[in-house]
Regions:
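Surface-exposed patches in mature extracellular/periplasmic domains of secreted proteins
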Residues: 32-44, 132-136, 177-178, 219-223
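Sec-exported extracytoplasmic/periplasmic mature domains
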Residues: 12, 26, 30-34, 88-91, ...
């Protein structure tokens, strides 16, 4: 049984009333790979947009392993210092990481964000030299559509992320660069230009699953869903 730890920002923690892509991926993997697959992490809640705090357990379907390491407004900058303890405490086999939008939007430029990616990987391997990782580039979002300098930073960061994966991948602790969800459309797959709706959740889940299927033979292809 493989243990997966989702690591991310608001798109990963999700909001009250949502399924989240975490749930969609768990469903996908247990149906196409191993019914005993599980998600692990030090956190469990959703973000409550009414209170502005990660205090909700109001999942659209709560009957799944809800654990994660994700936070509204958190990025590589925030997760790099946390990942070591999270790995030691929760013992994941695979990290599924979707970060970068918050860093680029509020804290660091593309080069600085890429350095935090490398710090994250170093800290993860210090906790478990054999941990596997799947990293998702920053996907389309409303700010990149309307803010050309920000879009340039996103594009540069995604190039630097790919370079970090190429530089740091190693046999005992492989790192995969997932492809952005094909045909991801912020006007169809999000509810506000950034955060995924049901179809977006399925697309993000399949991006992670597809990378692992192609590289590691985990699972098999399935028909994309939108609900």
């Amino acid at each position: 049984m493989l243990r997966f730890m989702p690591v991310g920002d608001s798109m990963t923690i999700g909001s009250a009333g949502e399924h989240t892509w975490r749930h969609r991926l768990w469903q996908l993997l247990r149906g196409t790979y191993d019914p005993a697959v599980t998600l692990v992490g030090p956190r469990e809640t959703l973000y409550d947009q009414q209170t502005g705090a990660p205090t909700s357990l109001d999942y659209a379907d709560p009957d799944f392993p809800r654990a994660h390491l994700a936070g509204w407004g958190e990025g590589w900058l925030h997760m790099a210092p946390l990942i070591g303890d999270a790995i030691r405490d929760c013992r994941p086999d695979v990290l599924l990481v979707s970060l970068g939008l918050i860093d680029l939007g509020f804290y660091t430029n593309a080069e600085q964000t890429a350095e935090n990616v490398r710090a994250f990987i170093t800290a993860a391997r210090a906790a478990d030299p054999c941990v596997r990782m799947v990293l998702l580039p920053v996907i389309p979002n409303v700010r990149a559509e309307s803010d050309a300098p920000f879009a340039d930073q996103v594009a540069l960061f995604n190039v630097l992320l790919a370079k970090a994966v190429a530089d740091l991948d190693e046999p005992r602790s492989p790192i995969l660069l997932a492809s952005p969800p094909p045909s991801y459309d912020i006007h169809v797959d999000t509810y506000d230009g950034t955060h995924p709706n049901a179809s977006g959740e399925h697309r993000i889940a399949e991006a992670f699953a597809g990378a692992m299927r192609e590289a590691w033979g985990i699972g098999r292809a399935c028909v994309a869903r939108t609900v």
